[in-house]
Amino acid sequence: PNGILIIPADNPTGLQMSQNTINEIAKICVEEDIWLVSDEAYRNIYFSGSGPSSIWQISNTDVPGILGRRISIESVSKVWNACGLRIGALVTDNKMMYQKVRSEYTANLCANVIGQYVFGAVAQMSSDEIIDWYSSQRAYYSKAITSLIKELKKELPGIILSSPGAAIYIVLDFKNITPSDFNVSKFIEYCSLNGKIRIKKKYYTLLL
């Protein structure tokens, strides 16, 4: 079986794929009889007024035949701030796929214990509590991103910055402020060996 993999809230560009684009891709999947797989780790971190973009926003009226073709990759690492736990889920509206995946990974995988506790705790939350959490996360990241962009422009006049529509990534373009012989590889090597940043009187390694 074949499929198309999409990332509606992109890492590392911060671009948000429109729902209309996802619907058009879904039509191709129906026409070609293939799966539509979507990495939705950042689904609820969006900054546009259009809301989240997701394969689960597609109705059978929008794309006849889409039911039973969708698989989403879910994770607690992003929206739930649990990057080290490495736990998530595959969600599908295809019963056969669900049964096969459950059989395969029950035998082959076991998530870490603390990750299971966290994921289990999320399952006990009400819909309203989860929606409130998503809203608080968007507000937090929106403020942080706006502040970061402002400070970067102040400290590095001429730098080109993207403004994310979703996820938590900003693309920095240094072409207007670096010399013509600037070597990216050497800069990254320097940062990994010597780079550090001071935050609240403590120094941290600068990773790019």
What does each of the following model-derived ranges do?
Residues P1-L208:
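PLP-dependent class I/II
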